[in-house]
Amino acid sequence: VSQIVESGMLMNDRPAVLRRRSWSVIFGIAVVGLGIGMFIAVLKVTSMSGFRTGWQGIPVYLVIAGLIGRIVNCKVVLREDVLTVINPLRTHTVPRAVIDSAAPGEDGGLEVTLSGGRTVPVFAYGGSFIDHFRGTSGAAAETINRWLRTGSDPDGSSAGAAVSWTRCRPADVAVLSGVLLAGGGALWMALTGG
């Protein structure tokens, strides 16, 4: 199964989370595999050229792991009256009252259509090759549409959709660490010369 519906449909006042299970598995394999590969590469370059050159793979690994982490963080969260689409860079928080429907787009990716015709793309269901055979975007759309039908009637007082920057602490720490390490290492290399 390529999606997880965590904690059911709002069971015990907990939100339902729609995401691809495969992304978590791929992330784990990629981070561990890249980590082992990068460690071996750093050791090899260090043994041939010294640590002055060998360390440079470490920030590259941290930035790549952070970017992969942002992708894996993508999901759709269904709360009582709010749908939240968490994409790699932007998070869309949309009240139930302004959502018309959810459906797979022409490219196979999931889209949430708001009143007024605006659509919010869902990166977590971005129309992958597997989607065309497994129909995971369609299944996620059905779950969202069922959530829309089972909710309370909108009272008309809901505000519009809000968009904010996505926060993903582990990924952000990895990217920031990579950038700081690269900057610090470049400064160290410049100061020590040679």
Language model features with spans:
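N-terminal membrane-targeting/pre-transmembrane regions
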Residues: 1-48, 149-194
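Hydrophobic alpha-helical transmembrane segments
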Residues: 27, 49-61
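Acidic, Ser/Thr-rich low-complexity segments on the non-lumenal side of membrane proteins
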Residues: 92-125
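Conserved beta-hairpin
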Residues: 61-101
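Alpha-helix capping and helix-coil boundary motifs
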Residues: 48-54, 129, 136
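A broad, low-specificity signal for short, low-complexity segments enriched in glycine/proline
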Residues: 35-48, 60-64, 69-74
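A membrane-cytosol interface segment of integral membrane proteins
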Residues: 114-172
